[in-house]
């Protein structure tokens, strides 16, 4: 049994398979997941697990070069936006329209669905390198 890091076998496998610039998405329970993209559904009830809890665990185990968010999060969920900025200090941040965000999810290696039920609590993590 693993002693630390991501314990979920599906998430751990996706993280291990990422190459430079590959993307994964951590999503609230309402984000549409495109056909053909791997769905890792962690939602057990409204709010559990939370978006921020899942983001923290994944971010601790992943080299992140860039973060993409829907620009609507700035006004409609300022608290989550602030938390993301505090948790992910080093990567570059990119804000796009929610429609553009959803289009970008079609290229993701996986989408991790949380139980989060607040608006625009979604992030695309772009893999960096560890060297």
UniProtKB/Swiss-Prot annotation:
Q: Which top EC class is named for this enzyme in its record?
A: isomerase
Biological processes annotated in GO: D-ribose catabolic process
Lipoprotein in keyword set: no
Decide whether keyword Cell inner membrane is in the record: no
The pathway to which it is assigned is: Carbohydrate metabolism; D-ribose degradation; D-ribose 5-phosphate from beta-D-ribopyranose: step 1/2
The record's section on SUPFAM superfamilies has: RbsD-like
Residues engaged in binding substrate: 28, 98, 120-122
Cellular location of this protein? Cytoplasm
Q: Which keywords fit this entry according to its UniProt record? A: Carbohydrate metabolism, Cytoplasm, Isomerase
Q: Which residues form a coiled coil?
A: none
GO cellular component terms, semicolon-separated = cytosol
Q: Which reaction does it catalyse?
A: beta-D-ribopyranose = beta-D-ribofuranose
Q: Known EC number(s)? A: 5.4.99.62
The protein's matches in InterPro entries, at most eight in alphabetical order, are given as: D-ribose_pyranase, RbsD-like_sf, RbsD_FucU
- Show the active-site residues: 20 (proton donor)
Q: Name one GO molecular function term.
A: D-ribose pyranase activity
On the tree of life, the source organism's domain of life is Bacteria
Name the predominant localization: cytoplasm
| Assembly with partners or alone | Homodecamer.
User: Into which family does the record put it?
Assistant: Belongs to the RbsD / FucU family. RbsD subfamily.
Q: Report the NCBIfam families cross-referenced here.
A: PRK11797.1
What does the UniProt record say this protein does? Catalyzes the interconversion of beta-pyran and beta-furan forms of D-ribose.
Quote the protein name from its UniProt record: D-ribose pyranase
